[in-house]
A protein has these predicted regions:
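Extracytoplasmic "Venus flytrap"
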Residues: 36-49, 54-79, 90-103, 122-125, ...
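Hydrophobic core
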Residues: 9, 13-17
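Short, well-structured alpha-helical segments in soluble
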Residues: 98-114
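An alpha-beta-alpha
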Residues: 76, 173-214
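Positively charged n-region of N-terminal signal peptides that target proteins for export
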Residues: 1-9
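Bacterial lipoprotein signal-peptidase II cleavage site
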Residues: 18-32
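Flexible loop/hinge segments that line or gate small-molecule binding clefts
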Residues: 134-164
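Periplasmic-binding protein-like
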Residues: 112-123, 142-144
Length: 214
């Protein structure tokens, strides 16, 4: 599990570098000297045995949202490609109106389709993830956007769940600092998801502090 997390996070951090390469490589090229970007790897693949070892459960919104979903799934694809693993993404039913049951159904489908690791993006996955992780105890879950260890209904830490939090405030700080250094002084911030979205609020706090420090 630790090895998977280290490689997944490394892949996600390398995403920006890979995406910045000006020349795409031909799919299937095994030349280790060539850089493969996430865009070179298909979003969907066909497993010979119908099983998919790594699953990604999307947050609300489109897979290609240029944000949490896309960044996380690109990391999954890069890891799977580098380690010859099968992968599949699942989008809970009803999109923005998805319920905990919808999210659980997506996780259960992933586990039943052979997933050994299920990566879930977004804090709204919490209730469904706790239920799924308890039922599928032999599957490892990666909870993206969780700021503390995940516990079960009895308050016990779930050993098959790894919690990873984005540090949005650091990204916001750099953005705020950079925009002022570029000469812009009349600033505003409009965060997506409304005023009660913790991730957007953290980004906004960082943005204001970065602009102030500049």
């Amino acid at each position: 599990m630790k090895k998977f997390l280290a490689l997944l996070l490394s892949a996600m951090m390398l995403l920006a570098l890979a995406a910045g390469c000006g020349e795409n490589n031909t799919k299937g090229n095994n030349d280790s000297d060539k850089t493969i970007s996430a865009d070179d790897i298909p979003d969907e693949m066909t497993s010979e045995d119908g099983k998919y070892e790594i699953a990604f459960i999307t947050d609300v919104g489109a897979l290609k949202d240029k944000s949490f979903n896309q960044g996380t799934f690109d990391g999954v694809k890069l890891y799977a490609h580098a380690n010859n693993k099968t992968y599949k993404y699942y989008q809970p039913a009803n999109d923005a109106q998805a319920t905990d049951d919808d999210r659980y159904d997506a996780m259960a489908a992933a586990a039943q389709n052979g997933a050994k690791v299920i990566v879930c993006a977004g804090f709204m996955q919490a209730n469904a993830l706790v239920k799924a992780a308890a039922e599928f105890a032999d599957v490892n879950f990666v909870f993206i956007d969780a700021s503390s260890p995940v516990t079960d209904a009895n308050g016990n830490i779930m050993n098959n769940v790894a919690a990873i939090a984005f540090q949005e405030e650091q990204c916001g700080y750099l953005a705020g600092y950079a925009v002022v250094m570029e000469g812009y002084k009349a600033l505003g911030f409009a965060g997506g998801g409304g005023g009660d979205n913790p991730a957007c609020c953290r980004y906004g706090y960082g943005f204001v502090q970065g602009a102030n420090d500049a």
